[in-house]
């Protein structure tokens, strides 16, 4: 990410090297002068249509971005199904029922499994650079990275959230939110934030709720049933944001652990990390911390194996094609097994009687509910992908990488859009086409989904470019400006770029 100060100095250098050409010179060289209207409208262009931008090079962990993008897409689909269909499509599969309920396929309309995947990815991503620097003996640099991450983490998560939910408060005053009575029979009625008498009361209510939502200390740690977390941690202006306080608290605990153990011998650190993960899950059912620490452990294991391979003498791979095929078969088997375990129906809604899951569900203690098998399956999925690069191609394609880039913005905007545009379109298409038969209803919802997804992708892309990236750049800039030099330990040195 280019910092603001660095980009300014780069522009200065460019202008010194190549003086600006006059309009006459540009016309002579058949260069059309810039169009002001095009410049102003340029901010509305989605990032994928800007052909001048070079394609981002893939790196060793790019598949994590793609996996995050696919999971974010499935979460949006899940929330759409809750507002456009009844609970029946999320029930366990039984012979003769819809194919959408089948294992693996049901992940396309599920929500909880992808939340677990998000948290494993977050643990891996936050740990990767500090662990890599620590293993290289660059402890000061690792400490600097951790310090920067801790400083910027709250702003990284909550500044874009505050900006988006501010517009939710405005939309509430404009009566853009739908009412539950217009869509009967759906699993979750349309959500409407608190509606106050005037704009000033609305903004005051928004400000207080936002401050409570961003509380870095008083929020409860994710424990037990995620359904209870939704009730305790949700933002009144967007109920899907309940995972952000969980993400913040879990990331702070992980970063504190990394800071404490960055200088510890690698295998000892891995042993402590494993012990902490087991303790969090088995004794306290802190499933979010379990997932974050497991993500860190997977990352540390990958770096450990990389070091072991680098110390070996170079030799030709003499394995036969049958051994290669066997290794790939193991990878595919673990991948499919992880997806099947992630597809476990909610035990409280008939999952213990679902075909194929009866024996497995009977082995899970009651106290864990759904917070044992699916988290372990999410860990298994990331672990499998990390050690079988041939499977990573599923998440390094252009679509997955693009969805990964806009995943946080997509997460922020889809809830408000679903409860305003998605709800209104659903009512109007049903009124136009009819919802008296299943076929008519599906046609109406399909048209609704097409328009909703188009607008959601465009808005998410806009928020990604001008809110998400900007908040990252500003937080980095602020951190750099507040740093003090080691030569003057008692005075703050304001850095000029």
UniProtKB/Swiss-Prot annotation:
TM stretches of this protein: 69-89, 107-127, 157-177, 241-261, 278-298, 329-349, 375-395, 406-426, 443-463
Family annotation (Pfam families): Acyl_transf_3
GO CC entries: membrane
Highest taxon in the source lineage: Eukaryota
Keyword line: Acyltransferase, Glycoprotein, Membrane, Transferase, Transmembrane, Transmembrane helix
Predominant location category: membrane
Residues carrying a glycan: 35
Bilayer disposition of the protein: Multi-pass membrane protein
Location of the protein in the cell: Membrane
Gene Ontology MF term list: acyltransferase activity, transferring groups other than amino-acyl groups
Pathway, per record: Mycotoxin biosynthesis
Cystine pairs: none
InterPro entries xrefs: Acyl_transf_3_dom, Acyltransferase_3
PANTHER family per record: ACETYLTRANSFERASE (PTHR23028), PUTATIVE (AFU_ORTHOLOGUE AFUA_4G08520)-RELATED (PTHR23028:SF134)
UniProt record similarity statement: Belongs to the acyltransferase 3 family.
Function comment: O-acetyltransferase; part of the 2 gene clusters that mediate the biosynthesis of fusicoccins, diterpene glucosides that display phytohormone-like activity and function as potent activators of plasma membrane H(+)-ATPases in plants by modifying 14-3-3 proteins and cause the plant disease constriction canker.
Name this polypeptide is given: O-acetyltransferase PaAT-1
Organism whose genome encodes this protein: Phomopsis amygdali (Fusicoccum amygdali)
Gene encoding the protein: PaAT-1
């Amino acid at each position: 990410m280019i910092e603001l100060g660095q980009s300014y100095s780069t522009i200065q250098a460019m202008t010194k090297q190549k003086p600006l050409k006059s309009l006459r010179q540009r016309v002579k060289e058949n260069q059309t002068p810039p169009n002001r209207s095009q410049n102003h409208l340029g901010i509305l262009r989605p990032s994928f249509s800007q052909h001048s931008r070079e394609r981002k090079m893939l790196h060793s962990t790019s598949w994590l971005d793609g996996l995050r993008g696919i999971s974010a897409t499935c979460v949006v689909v899940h929330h759409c199904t809750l507002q456009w269909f009844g609970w029946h499509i999320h029930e366990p599969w039984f012979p003769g029922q819809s194919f959408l309920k089948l294992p693996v396929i049901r992940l396309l309309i599920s929500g909880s499994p992808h939340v677990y995947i998000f948290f494993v990815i977050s643990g891996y991503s936050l740990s990767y650079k500090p662990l890599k620097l620590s293993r290289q003996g660059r402890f000061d640099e690792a400490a600097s990275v951790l310090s920067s991450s801790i400083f910027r983490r709250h702003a990284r998560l909550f500044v874009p959230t505050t900006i988006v939910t501010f517009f939710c408060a405005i939309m509430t005053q404009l009566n853009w939110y739908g009412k539950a009575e217009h869509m009967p029979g759906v699993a979750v009625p349309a959500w409407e934030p608190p509606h106050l008498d005037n704009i000033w009361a609305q903004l005051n209510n928004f400000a207080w709720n936002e401050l409570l939502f961003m509380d870095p200390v008083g929020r409860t740690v994710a424990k037990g049933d995620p359904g209870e977390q939704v009730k305790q941690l949700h933002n009144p202006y967007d109920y899907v944001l309940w995972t952000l306080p969980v993400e913040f608290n879990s990331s702070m605990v992980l970063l504190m652990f990394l800071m404490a153990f960055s200088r510890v011998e690698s295998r000892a650190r891995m042993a402590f990390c494993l012990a902490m993960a087991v303790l969090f899950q088995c004794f306290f059912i802190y499933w979010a911390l379990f997932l974050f620490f497991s993500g860190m452990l997977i990352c540390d294991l990958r770096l450990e194996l990389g070091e072991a391979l680098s110390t070996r003498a170079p030799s030709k791979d003499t394995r036969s094609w049958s051994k290669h095929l066997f290794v790939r078969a193991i990878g595919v088997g673990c991948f499919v097994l992880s997806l099947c375990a992630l597809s476990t129906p909610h035990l409280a809604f008939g999952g213990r009687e679902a075909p194929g899951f009866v024996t497995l569900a009977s082995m899970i203690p009651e106290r864990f509910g759904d917070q044992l098998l699916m988290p372990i399956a999410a860990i298994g999925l990331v672990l499998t992908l990390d050690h079988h690069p041939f499977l990573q191609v599923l998440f390094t394609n252009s679509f997955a990488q693009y969805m990964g880039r806009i995943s946080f913005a997509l997460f922020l905007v889809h809830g408000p859009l679903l409860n305003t545009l998605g709800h209104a379109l659903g009512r109007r298409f049903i009124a136009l086409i009819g919802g008296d038969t299943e076929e008519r209803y599906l046609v109406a919802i399909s048209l609704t989904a097409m328009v909703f997804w188009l607008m959601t992708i465009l808005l998410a892309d806009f928020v990604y470019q001008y809110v998400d990236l900007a908040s990252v750049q500003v937080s980095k800039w602020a951190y750099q400006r507040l740093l003090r030099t080691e030569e003057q330990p008692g005075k703050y040195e304001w850095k000029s770029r």
